[in-house]
Amino acid sequence: MACPGFLWALVISTCLEFSMAQTVTQSQPEMSVQEAETVTLSCTYDTSESDYYLFWYKQPPSRQMILVIRQEAYKQQNATENRFSVNFQKAAKSFSLKISDSQLGDAAMYFCAYRS
């Protein structure tokens, strides 16, 4: 049972990739934050490709997967979508999602994905 005022975000290590020999890893199995806090979810990946896309999806209790944000590897500017932003570090192969001013509706499982 969740406590009022707390958001539960499950982060499942997953590999939602569309090409072979690529790996995507998420390190946090579960997080909880209070409403209005900022939370950062981390993702690393391994690829030898130079042109690719990275995505963050969320799956709320309704079980419908929703695209939160995407980043093209050739763009140097980090993607931003309302309260969601990424910290994309191509050289370090790191792709973190930052959720600012978290809300109860943000409670979900979050998935990092790669596509070449």
From Swiss-Prot:
It comes from the Eukaryota. GO terms for cellular component: immunoglobulin complex; T cell receptor complex. Pfam families: V-set (PF07686). Keywords: Adaptive immunity, Cell membrane, Disulfide bond, Glycoprotein, Immunity, Immunoglobulin domain, Membrane, Receptor, Signal, T cell receptor. It is found in: Cell membrane. Residues 1-21 form the signal peptide. This is T cell receptor alpha variable 38-2/delta variable 8. It comes from Homo sapiens (Human).
